[in-house]
Amino acid sequence: MKTKLFQKLIPAYVMLALGFAACKKENAALHTKSGITDAGEKVKTASTSSAYYIKAGETHNFVYGNILTSYNSYRVNTTTSTGTAYEWYNVSQIYADAAMVKIGNTAYAPYMNNTFAWMNNMWNGSNPNGGYFAAANINGTGAAGDQYVDDNALSGVAYLDAYDVTTGTTQINYLNAAKACANWLMNSGQWDNTYGGGFWWNTVKESKPTQSNGLAMQLFLRLYQITGQTFYRDWSVSVKNWLLANMFDSATGLYIWKIDGSGAGTKHFEKFTYDNAIMTEAFLLYAQIMADNSFVTKAQNLGIAMNTTLWNSTYHVYRFNTADGRVNPAWCVWGSQAMIRLYQRDGNTAWLDYAQQNIDYINSKLRNATNLGYYTFCNFDGSGLDTRQEGVDQAWMQRTQALLSDYR
């Protein structure tokens, strides 16, 4: 996520000024689908009757009219960076469209598949290990520079969601692409013994953050579930062990931002909503795929900690992080996805209440009532509105509202 950590602790308008400077089981039957099983999901409503389903569709209409390009890529935003495509923005839209296909709207499949084909432009074909670059021009030229663990890991996760809703050659292509992302993670030198292990954020190797490692853990788990290859299992266990040993803050019950610096490193104890949402999902996957229910408890405890520390009980929304009280659609609504996953596992509707109220706040404060796209930042009371409309924010609001529409 090329722009993400740069933006974490500086104002959004400053971040933008930085510009384009540069996500075999032994003795076990193989699975054909990945992720949390449908058997774990609770009572659903008809998606098409849900106001959230309608809003997800309206969000996609905004994307179609304003963010999608004639090349089948997605521009960064509608104003200041219309000629550039960010890797994780594009793959987030694939992730969003896969969610719509999963709940029954197959009209989204061509958008998903066309952008997947365009993503080849961002792949590092000159390196045997491959891996996605962070950015390119919207026509697919100019991909170069640093490569990011979270970009490649998120890409693999999104492709496995697309794998779940496709068949035949298309399905095989999504699986192979997810494997290629994992191959880059395993063989590009982004994991080393600095700080006792863990993945670097990117090829510059300036920090090791929770979210890069949590997304990698998700990808390895899901590939193990599908393929049964034990090296994916072993990688997931290594990442899990490093996260538990190095990134968990027992004082808050949350995962910290990152480790950087020389020697043993300096831990940065800011807590981010999406970091902890990613870890919640990773633990739920671990519980299911590794048949270890202690990780259900870990996920539930992490959800409780999120709702204690990262939830604003006055405005009923997740904060960006503990050092920044603003709200952003993509990074804050990731918390809703985690709450929906918790509900799917244990049936506690309180999780859905948090997911819904968080989305309701974003719809109230950050949605343009005319064009129905989302702005990128505001303060809790709605002031300080940053009116850029970023592609990734639209993608995540489409995706999470599609997920919620199964239940509310």
Q: Language-model features: where?
A:
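Bacterial N-terminal signal peptides that target proteins for export
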Residues: 2-12
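C-terminal motif of bacterial Sec signal peptides marking the signal peptidase cleavage site
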Residues: 19-22
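Low-complexity, Ser/Thr/Pro/Gly-enriched N-terminal "stalk/linker" regions
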Residues: 25-142, 172-201, 237-238, 242, ...
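The feature captures the catalytic groove of carbohydrate-active enzymes
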Residues: 61, 65-68, 127-131, 135, ...
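Solvent-exposed loop and edge beta-strand segments that line ligand/cofactor-binding
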Residues: 71-98, 102, 135-155, 200-213, ...
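Well-ordered alpha-helical scaffold segments within catalytic/enzyme domains
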Residues: 91-107, 154-169, 215-229, 278-292, ...
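Oxyanion-binding "anion nests"
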Residues: 272-290, 295-310
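A beta-strand-loop signature enriched in Asp, Gly, Thr, and Trp
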Residues: 295-338
